[in-house]
Amino acid sequence: MSRFFIDRPIFAWVLAIIAMLAGALSLTKMPISQYPNIAAPAVSIQVVYPGASAKTVQDTVVQVIEQQLNGLDGFRYMAAESASDGSMNIIVTFEQGTNPDIAQVQVQNKLQLATPRLPEEVQRQGLRVVKYQMNFFMVVGLVDKTGKMTNFDLGNLIASQLQDPISRINGVGDFLLFGSPYAMRIWLDPGKLNSYQLTPGDVAQAIREQNVQVSSGQLGGLPTRSGVQLNATVVGKTRMTTPAEFEEILVKVKADGSQVRVKDLGRVVLASENFAISAKYRGQDSAGLGLRLASGGNLLETVKAVKAELEKQKAYLPEGVEVIYPYDTSPVVEASIDSVVHTILEAVVLVFLVMFLFLQSLRATIIPTLAVPVVLLAAFALLPYFGISINVLTMYAMVLAIGLLVDDAIVVVENVERLMHDEGLSPLEATRKSMGQISGALVGIGMVLSAVFVPMAFFGGSAGIIYKQFAVTIVICMSLSVLVALIFTPALCATILKAPENDAHHEKKGFFGWFNRSFDRNSARFERGVGGILKHRGRYLLIFALITAGTGYLFTQIPKAFLPSEDQGLMMTEVRMPLNASAERTEVVLQEVKDYLLKEEGQLVDHVMTVNGFNFAGRGQNSGLVLVVLKDWAARQAAGEDVLSVAERANARFARIKDATVMAFVPPAVLEMGNAMGFDLYLQDNLGLGHESLMAARNQFLELAAENPSLRAVRPNGKDDEPQFQVKIDDEKARALQVSIASINDTMSAAWGSMYVNDFIDLGRVKRVYIQGVDSSRIAPEDFDKWYVRNALGEMVPFSAFATGEWIHGSPKLERYGGISAVNILGEPAPGFSTGDAMIAIAQIMQQLPSGIGLSYNGLSYEEIRTGDQAPMLYALTVLIVFLCLAALYESWSVPMSVILVVPLGIFGAVLATLWRGLEADVYFQVGLMTTVGLSAKNAILIIEFAKELYEKEGVPLVKAAIEAARLRLRPIIMTSLAFTFGVLPMARATGAGAGSQHSIATGVVGGMITATVLAVFFVPLFYVVVVKVFERNKKPAALAEEELA
């Protein structure tokens, strides 16, 4: 094949140009994201039961739904939480590869079976089923620069005008409103109700009867008799729109004809539906809409669509109201992609310089450089067919591929140059002879490197998604690289290279002359060194065994993790106030946190948004959240200016805040996989020990974790039990007084909860009508005595006649995991420890907890456990596949063994470099390790291919063949290894977005290449000689027999 294109160079150019054009066209159409869909698909079921406690919601809603969630395809696990505000959320997580749309449909079908068993009030509220991601990908908000609108006004504006169009955008999965829409609020006075002998149920019934939309039909509607001349729509009663209309609702007509209307029983106002959450942006009242990405959504495209929609809506906002973006993850994505693009450009330049240093000819250097755009662009034409998008993982793979793909071209060019210099051949003749010598080696290298990565593409879970991005991209690049080296590069060599004049290679002056003389001297020393090693094989085999054993030991010392930490320019701070603390107290702490961040860290922090009434541990007046966005990475280059350092200083300062627990934390590397980096686990009550026992086990766990040096910031992702006032109804007394239990329940729901009645129309939108007691009637336990229920005789009976109350302790938030009562705990490894170390410590702590308390990991931690279990299989399978490919290629068992023996030498350097930089054995390290395995094997193949040729075909004695092959291939091995190492070096020294993952990949690769090159060139001849002697002792070829006689 190579000869065909050597004789037809224009044909080769045409193919290269077509490949580049196809890639450029594909590049403009490929989606761009920071990561592929690494997070497992999940579906969320959301329900509200107004006025219900967390326990009530768990018993009457959560468990009913859980019992129906069986038989779902690809089901992995489910987690549920219920809160004291009546809200409930069940998150069902599926295996990677499950279609999120089908998963959502299946969950909805199962939910239909559970719906008839749910409380009527829950059914009336409706159930939401949405595709779900854990973290917000952005928060959009509104502020009023005039100061006229409160956060509740702004919340209504978002709910009325922005929420629907934004939530319909493709890619938006779920949302959380930091604010609330308006509702028609009817505040009932219990004294007035009692004086008119009415109950909240009477008011609700009157509203339902009079606030209705009546479908009245038509005049002259068909069928009718002939001669009818009129057809008109009959308009009946419509829903009310203003507080004044609701005030006039007739509740009761007395015997004397006097009327009791709603306005006689309390106040009617247009007010917020929910007062629990309020927000501030840079100290101003604001409201926000937190958006979660839909499973499978494209983050950049979704952010672009959201901002475009908001630009359209700006024209319809009141004067002075501005759109803000207090939290946006898209700059992280863009910065990560830009960083890798710069890395690729740096890699190309460095590779070019290394090649020029060795080839010392601009013509010879340009040839392998031209291979880079051809292969990379052609790869983009093929990637979409494998479901691969443009993301940081494919770009990292491209960086690795640059060093790999120029290797093949360098091997061709260097061998052609050698033949021209050593044998005086013309470029055309040298190219033809060269391709006859090295075509097998090129195919072998391509097969080996492909074999290294192919097994990675078939692993499951989130790690499998990461492996696949690298595997597919590198295998495509390697395959194209081999084709370019067999088609395009020979054509360029035959037409671009010039024959040397008077052995010019050895007569160069200046720097290149010095370099060549130095390299030749060192080559001679190297040749003598290889000869010495082959004379003392036993000694050096022992050294190799020690290196291998040391590598195994050092490997066990690397801390384990799933993904490295990243500076994404984002930080969150949770505020947890004491039990039963008011929203006013929480606001004071939120302001203190905000002031510290904007004043003490003002040079690094761009802006903050505070949210009162909500954090990831739950909702409530004692909860708060601060969203922090740091300045651009270019403005934070100095030591101590990264987000982890900012969070560390912030936590040291927040520890001094009295009467509050304030914790700053950083999002995980993959934002869709959690809210905070570290570990995420559930303690489960496997034996049904009860809530008190579970909480006691949780507290014991937290105490033991606080004493463990490898753990820090271990905290419950929930709420402690708090004082609750329990009302006990004496059914016997109630029946004796002829009071209906249903009337009692209705009165309690309306008085202290918030009873949803029906809907009204506000500015053309449907909103809700609620009745509730005035604030003075629901402040203290004594206020229960203010409420009355009407019995069957029409008499008003006070609550105190049939009800008593007492203070108890109960949880404002209950959790379940896998259908079992559980508590969620988050934490981080202490400085100097990894998440793998933390998990070992957790396992030790679990042994001290009571029997019946189980442990399950969630989110990123679940993936880390799963990845750790897969890693040994990945290593073993990779080595096995490489061995089998080489055996098939060379029709020999000895050659593959010689190649495989070199692998520990590369791993040795990778492990040393990773330990030296204090990095962890994460998924990226494993990718780097597999790359090192392939490159180590490649160097071995280059030597063994020549030694095999000399020994088996030319009859050169075995030892001489090994020494000669090592001498001949030393220069290309050093050149290709340096080219690859310098190509990866920009990743090893990267800063800014995505630097953690780049360091993790490149550090191991650079360290592995150094040892794989420095040690392998000495040990590969030894391995080849020893293996041939062992495997072919009985064959006794002529050269081997001659050598033994000598």
Swiss-Prot record:
Keyword Cell inner membrane attached: yes
GO-annotated molecular function: efflux transmembrane transporter activity; xenobiotic transmembrane transporter activity
UniProt entry keywords in alphabetical sequence: Cell inner membrane, Cell membrane, Membrane, Transmembrane, Transmembrane helix, Transport
Record Gene3D superfamilies: Multidrug efflux transporter AcrB pore domain, Multidrug efflux transporter AcrB pore domain like, Multidrug efflux transporter AcrB TolC docking domain, DN and DC subdomains, Multidrug efflux transporter AcrB transmembrane domain
Induction per the UniProt record: The ttgDEF operon is induced in the presence of toluene and styrene, but not m-xylene.
Gene Ontology cellular component list: plasma membrane
SUPFAM superfamilies for the chain: Multidrug efflux transporter AcrB pore domain, PN1, PN2, PC1 and PC2 subdomains, Multidrug efflux transporter AcrB TolC docking domain, DN and DC subdomains, Multidrug efflux transporter AcrB transmembrane domain
Topology with respect to the bilayer: Multi-pass membrane protein
Pfam families per record: ACR_tran
Transmembrane segments: 10-30, 339-359, 370-390, 392-412, 440-460, 470-490, 542-562, 871-891, 895-915, 927-947, 973-993, 1008-1028
Location in or out of the cell: Cell inner membrane
Job description of the protein: The inner membrane transporter component of an inducible organic solvent efflux pump. Involved in export of toluene and styrene but not of m-xylene, propylbenzene or ethylbenzene. Is not involved in antibiotic or AMP efflux.
Listed PANTHER family: MULTIDRUG EFFLUX PUMP SUBUNIT ACRB-RELATED (PTHR32063:SF13), PTHR32063
Family named by the database record: Belongs to the resistance-nodulation-cell division (RND) (TC 2.A.6) family.
The name this protein goes by in its record: Toluene efflux pump membrane transporter TtgE
Lineage, uppermost ranks: Bacteria, Pseudomonadati, Pseudomonadota, Gammaproteobacteria, Pseudomonadales
Encoding gene, per UniProt annotation: ttgE
